[in-house]
Amino acid sequence: MAKTQNFVCFTAVLLILILVSTEIPMIEGKTCKLFRGECPVDPCEPEKCDECCKATFGKQICGKCEQESTELHCHCRR
């Protein structure tokens, strides 16, 4: 019984260590709420906006076309 518990604890700790070392929680934690800037995409298309934001601000950024008065602007958020 004790060997089984030790094995389960060791396996759980090993899996947590692997999960943290691969930065999976950071990748999933992208909330896209913090405004980082704008990208000059005209006309604003979601794919082009996202590509521009990633190229300008880094991989952890997501780009979204958002209405600003009468125009669509490409906003980059983290």
Swiss-Prot record:
Lineage: superkingdom: Eukaryota
Primary location group: secreted
Signal peptide residue numbers: 1-29
SS bond partners: C44-C65, C49-C74, C53-C76
Location(s) in or outside the cell: Secreted
Keyword match Signal: yes
GO cellular component: extracellular region
Biological processes, Gene Ontology terms: defense response to fungus; killing of cells of another organism; response to salt stress
Keywords: Antimicrobial, Disulfide bond, Fungicide, Plant defense, Secreted, Signal
UniProt record similarity statement: Belongs to the DEFL family.
UniProt protein name: Putative defensin-like protein 202
Source organism of this protein record: Arabidopsis thaliana (Mouse-ear cress)
